[in-house]
């Protein structure tokens, strides 16, 4: 399974939930990419782990099985600008 993760976090617990998701995805041997700005927030929180990153213009393709969006409605709407015409399903975590 190949998963992209994106978030615009303004809540402290978003990184906590991200860490939980990463733990579960690791158990499934998933390949995980994290959006570059969200990854910086993850590292700035003191969390560790190396993950490849993506941006709005590079790093995503139609080989991804899922795009996880952390945030509210606006974040999911912005997530659509990442996946565009790639056909990647978006899963929202509010």
What are the roles of these predicted feature ranges?
Residues 11-13, 40, 55-94:
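Small-residue-rich beta-alpha loop regions that form the catalytic core of phosphotransfer
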Residues 18, 46, 79-83:
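Short amphipathic alpha-helical segments
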Residues 20-30:
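A short, Lys/Arg-enriched amphipathic alpha-helix followed by its capping loop at the start of a domain
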Residues 30-37:
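Short internal beta-strands
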Residues 45-57:
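Active-site regions of enzymes building and remodeling cell-envelope glycoconjugates
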